[in-house]
Amino acid sequence: MGKWTGKKVAVLYGGRSSEREVSLRTGAACADALRARGHDVTLVDVDAELPARLRELRVDVAFVALHGRWGEDGCVQGLLECMGIPYTGSGVTASAMGMDKTVSKAIFKALGLDVIEYRAFPPARAAEIDLRDLPFGVPCVVKPAGEGSSVGVQIVKDAARLADACREAARYKGDVVVERYVKGTEVNVAVLEGKALGAIEIAPANEFYDYAAKYTAGTTRYYYPARIPEAHASRVMAAAEAAHRGLGCSGVTRVDFIVAPDGTPFILEVNTLPGMTATSLVPKIAAGLGLAFPELCERILDGAALKA
């Protein structure tokens, strides 16, 4: 029996971010899983009426299944703190830092983790960015600092495409981040309650693990455990735990890496509300350990608390 059995659980999903469709799938899957464990669950699509809706439902605890802005960035977490409703996942500060790639990269460097060389530019400068601003040149990776699910991310191989890619990234929230391109093995680590569960390797059909590759079944191959030497796997899982701890995260996170051929685990980001759909990586890793999806969701729910 879970900690919140018999209590009113609201699964918060949807919202207004560019990742709304993914959140709808995550929320529906988690709600079904929690119901299978005997919980009283109501799905709540997040909009401006959220405070009134939570009061009307007399919610005891919130399972946060949002992705992107206004959900993964500390906004909803702050509201829940003010309303005194315990919730899953990380608190306000950890969520905000994890969502902003410029801020999180600075923290990772301070923690002594391996960070790919990068430059960050305000959106107003996007149209002016050229190779003179980049000591590492091309190829490079351009991404918006405040989006997830690879939204707005492009690999630039031709200097003539750099300005267009930067302008595209500037359409989204936050700085424009340009990283040196590092060829290696893409590895994601699931961390639950501060402990790394395992590392999964991502092998997309195309060069880049983009939005379509993440959420379209059959477009990507996954290998669990990751096909990297044991020593490299140990390094990447230790780095994931350090990043989770360093940002002050709670509950479950997914930490993304590029592992270079020499074993250097270059950290890309910490996802404080990772996807929980049929194609998502945290459930795949948990399943590899024998932890079924309903039990995983209940473990996450059991960790719900006020963090402020």
UniProtKB/Swiss-Prot annotation:
Gene Ontology MF terms in the entry: ATP binding; D-alanine-D-alanine ligase activity; metal ion binding
Binding annotation for ATP: 133-188
Coiled coil location: none
PROSITE patterns named among the record's database cross-references: ATP_GRASP, DALA_DALA_LIGASE_1, DALA_DALA_LIGASE_2
Binding residues annotated for Mg(2+) 1, in chain numbering: D256, E269
GO CC aspect terms: cytoplasm
Domain of life of the organism encoding this protein: Bacteria
Cell compartment(s), UniProt: Cytoplasm
Cofactor(s) for this UniProt protein: Mg(2+); Mn(2+)
Gene3D superfamilies reported for this sequence: 3.40.50.20, ATP-grasp fold, A domain, ATP-grasp fold, B domain
InterPro entries documented for this protein: ATP-grasp, ATP_grasp_subdomain_1, D-Ala_lig_Van_CS, D_ala_D_ala, Dala_Dala_lig_C, Dala_Dala_lig_N, PreATP-grasp_dom_sf
Reaction(s) this enzyme catalyzes, per UniProt: 2 D-alanine + ATP = D-alanyl-D-alanine + ADP + phosphate + H(+)
Keywords from the named record: ATP-binding, Cell shape, Cell wall biogenesis/degradation, Cytoplasm, Ligase, Magnesium, Manganese, Metal-binding, Nucleotide-binding, Peptidoglycan synthesis
GO biological process, one term: peptidoglycan biosynthetic process
EC code(s) of this entry: 6.3.2.4
NCBIfam families: D_ala_D_alaTIGR, PRK01372.1
Function: Cell wall formation.
Protein name (Swiss-Prot/TrEMBL): D-alanine--D-alanine ligase
The species this protein was found in: Anaeromyxobacter sp. (strain Fw109-5)
